[in-house]
């Protein structure tokens, strides 16, 4: 194994041991010393906290007003039933939330297989027990809301302003969206030729059956790679804030007086006084204009009316006039 002293080893062996449909062991080697813990801990945290999945978030049980109660003919109390519902493994295709229904009567266990659902929903563990009915006349009816999410979201975090509008009897459930039930990693020694200081990463994990363990690790690695992309080329990814520069003067003030369409007599009088722009004109007062040769009161009235129609008037004060664009002409 020859190479540059600065060159890092890349894993060449990936072994996947499928213990069961929900349990797998993944071995990755060789890794440079220390990278076993670096990658193992990062993948473990992502698998536990950031994997998307579906979970029960709300439940309505006929005859039950709150979670601190019991139901006649049912062995478990309501809190225990809610706890069992948290363990319900559900796969939902193409939807972010669905409503499932359950109706069961007679003595015996109530399982996930008793839940009624459409073709977009799959109950992964139909044998999962929700409660037990202890009387021939006992019955239980539920409406179960399943939502898509990520990580763990307690019911208290979903209580907001609409809480007061929530119907009595609708029970909130702590939502554990992550399909990963258990994850552990171990770093063992590995050897390549003469090097004996290398790492071998062994990841062992169990899921609830809604995702294949191999696929879960693949997704976690993808999430990690996407988050690290920003460090590959360290640039400020924030978009620069574009500040709109407000013009120093109203654009109409920069237009020539010819745009006012005054009579020939009035226009010629203004040009004789070097009044070429509307900004020049509005700074003049009535007294100043009346001193202009050949400009009488009739022309003054015309000018005032035309300016008023554009929201302007005589005698205005303009700081820093004329602007550089005009002064240079």
UniProtKB/Swiss-Prot annotation:
GO terms for biological process: DNA-templated transcription. It is an enzyme of class 2 (transferase). Keywords: DNA-directed RNA polymerase, Nucleotidyltransferase, Transcription, Transferase. One of its GO terms (molecular function) is DNA-directed RNA polymerase activity. Residues 249-329 are annotated as: Alpha C-terminal domain (alpha-CTD). Its EC number is 2.7.7.6. The keyword Transferase applies. Residues 1-235 are annotated as: Alpha N-terminal domain (alpha-NTD). InterPro entries: DNA-dir_RNA_pol_insert, DNA-dir_RNA_pol_RpoA/D/Rpb3, DNA-dir_RpoA, RBP11-like, RNAP_asu_C, RNApol_insert_sf. The keyword Transcription applies. It catalyses: RNA(n) + a ribonucleoside 5'-triphosphate = RNA(n+1) + diphosphate. GO terms for cellular component: cytoplasm; DNA-directed RNA polymerase complex. Transmembrane segments: none annotated. It comes from the Bacteria. Homodimer. The RNAP catalytic core consists of 2 alpha, 1 beta, 1 beta' and 1 omega subunit. When a sigma factor is associated with the core the holoenzyme is formed, which can initiate transcription. DNA-dependent RNA polymerase catalyzes the transcription of DNA into RNA using the four ribonucleoside triphosphates as substrates. The N-terminal domain is essential for RNAP assembly and basal transcription, whereas the C-terminal domain is involved in interaction with transcriptional regulators and with upstream promoter elements. Belongs to the RNA polymerase alpha chain family. This is DNA-directed RNA polymerase subunit alpha. It comes from Sodalis glossinidius (strain morsitans). The gene is rpoA.
